[in-house]
Structure formats: C-alpha cells, structure tokens
C-alpha cells in the first residue's frame, strides 16, 4: 500500500518530466544544465544578487532556470529590463504565488504581491490617494521632522556621555516610528502591544516569511505537500507568520476601538467597508484587505528605508573622503547654528543628493526586484518567454554593469555630477524602486524618509568606529556592521 501511495505521489512528477524531455517549440534563453525533476533547484544560491552576476557573465543578460516545475528568467541588462518593464509591461505585470507571499499578503489582498487585476488596481489607487500623493506627503512632513528631532536628541545624549551607538537598531527605530505614526496613527513610545526595540525583529521575521520557500512552491499537488510534511517546512513558516500576524491584528484592533480620534488609511478603509455593507458595491473590502495594507505599509515602509539608511552610513563611514565632502557642503550651506533640520533644507543641497543617488545605485533595497509573472507569451531580446514564467530583474547587477558604469563597485557620488540619470523608473540602468505598473507606490515617501534622516545624522554629528579591528571589518567587508559605532557632537 505504501509503495502504491509513493507511486501516486511521484506519478505527476514523472509525467511532467517526460513531457519536458520533448524538444521545446520555444527559443528559450540560455542557462545552466537542468537536472531531472528538480531542474536548477540545487542552484538557488546562484540567484543571490552577487552570485547571479556570474550567471549573466557566463550565459548572457537573459538566463533561463527551472526551479522544480517553475520556469524562471533572470534579467541582468538595461536593455532587457526596459523590454520587460516598459515595452511588455502589461504582459509582465502579474506576480507569482508562493506560500510565503500568500501568507504575508493575506491571500493576495495587498498591493505588493497581488496578481494584476481589479483588487490590485483598487488597492493601489487607494494607497496613492490616502497615503502617497503629494498633498499627503506634505501633510505628514511634521511627523518625519518630529521623529528625527527625537532621534537627534537621543543621539546627542549618547554622544555627550561618549557611549557607543547601535546605529542599525537606531535607524530601524527611527523609520519604524515614522511609518507607524503615518500609516497607523501609532506612537511607538506609548503603544501597549509593541515597542521601539522590537521593530527590527518584526521586519526581519516578515521578510523571512516571504523568503522561506517550501516544496509546494516548486512542485505541484500531493508530492510537494508530502515533502513539506516530512520536513515540517510549513510549521516553521506558520510559526514566523503567527508572530507577525499578531502584530498586524493588534494594529487592526486598535483601529476598531470606539472613540478613536486620529484618521489614517486604515480608518478610511474601515469606513469604506461599513458603507459597502449598506450600498452593496461590486468590490468589497474585507479584513484581509485591511491586514494586507497594514502588511505592505509596515514591511515595505520600514524594511526598505531602514536598509538604505544603514547602507548609506556604512559607505560613508568606510569612505571618510566622501563623508567629509558631503558634510562640508551641508554645514557650509546651512550654517552651523541650526537647532533643527527641516525638509526645506534639502532643497539647498546638491552633492548630498548625488550621494543619496549613489547609495540607491550601489545598494538597492531590493537587489532583485519583486518577481513578476508573465500573463501571456512575450519575446524579450529575441527569446521566447512563455506565459506563467517568473521574471527576476537583477537591479543589483544592472547597477554594477561595467558596460554602464566606470568602476561600478566603487562608492563615488561624483559619477553623477554631469549625469541626468535618475532613480524614479525612467532610466533602466538605475532601478531601486522598479518601473512600470508595479513601480513602488511609496517611492516619494521612502526618498523623503531617507534624505531627512541622513541630513540630520550628517549635520549634527561626526561618526567613526571605536577600534581598528572593527574599522578593518567594515572597510573590507561586504556586509553591514553598524551594531556599535562612535558618535560625536559637531
């Protein structure tokens, strides 16, 4: 009986494998050799942004892989990216489904991971109107400035006592405080169910839910679920998801309390739900839509901006020449007697803006843009890309392509002095926020948070590392190492 069950489990895989042995009618992109059944699943590490540069060097700017029975195309050139994100944007604008993204998006009722369709269009339009429009961006300015003032006060106290600073945690707290006030009306210093110190942990657990692939993501039917059960894959995913979901549910419960005074995008959605119950609209908001929006705001808002700020300070500390040039411009332009920084101060700075652009180039928050999925067959650079193929845009590799950039691995804002290249989705050699229909809707908010945060850190303080050993680590290493830094009042 057990042998028969194993045969039934393996039968779909055997049939699909035999089907794949037939010569393909498509002119598929080149790629590494695929093993029976698992394809290139054993080479998933190759899709790490740094490793995938090696793939493109060996096979070209368009590489075809197969993870189990999931076809994947990796794009690593400006020209191919433009075809995907502009020429064939509509045909390539959906999202693949995985167990992790289904969980974190509440059954794809969000913006980031939802497939292309009515739900996605409605949610995106709502987010733009209620959260990311120019008018809303300006209305939240005081929150960004107040939270930066509090961060400066805290750092000034540490500097006066010559205490070391965990800058990584400090930046997660700063961004988390801004995003939670803007998105959810929650002050982390007064909140009953979350505090400042737990923000980075919640972000990392949310990211783990998305990144944790399990067998059913690559293999159909009973076989994938059986292997999941044997290795308890779903249990670990559910445990991570449960912690994150509790946080999101607490945010929603806080909005449902009677007598709530503040109004944010979640309150707007709750009001729309109540009206729809009476009016019977064709599109109906559900609790999953509410939590999907909460998830997007928290994960995309906190995770990306925090990571960018951390990388910016890492590069500046290990490149003191650039830091001095940026600080000289800031302090000469703004003077040395300002008690607080406002967003108006940003308009006076030029080299500072080039430095931010160089950070977006060298360290995009999403080195591999969120994967797209083709809705129909398309041709990219002469190759056939069938429907239901995952497309991964390697923004990291494109931004370090030696054909496009001189000394591409060097942190050098001067490269943009006479350049009109921008990072807002129209120049395909620089794609930190993506492009086309699925461009990050919170781009302007993210830029505002990063620029104001960096300006405060560089105007009021000087930065260094406490010991030579640590300095060597951050200068030569590729990873972020800002757990302990020295801060000095300017």
Curated annotation (Swiss-Prot):
The keyword Oxidoreductase applies. It is an enzyme of class 1 (oxidoreductase). Pfam families: p450. The chain crosses the membrane at residues 1-21. Its EC number is 1.14.-.-. Its cofactor is heme. One of its GO terms (molecular function) is heme binding. SUPFAM superfamilies: Cytochrome P450. It comes from the Eukaryota. It is found in: Membrane. Keywords: Heme, Iron, Membrane, Metal-binding, Monooxygenase, Oxidoreductase, Transmembrane, Transmembrane helix. It is a single-pass membrane protein. GO terms for cellular component: extracellular region; membrane. InterPro entries: Cyt_P450, Cyt_P450_CS, Cyt_P450_E_grp-I, Cyt_P450_sf, Cytochrome_P450_71. Heme binds at residue 440. PANTHER family: BIFUNCTIONAL DIHYDROCAMALEXATE SYNTHASE_CAMALEXIN SYNTHASE-RELATED, CYTOCHROME P450 71B11-RELATED. Belongs to the cytochrome P450 family. This is Cytochrome P450 71B28.
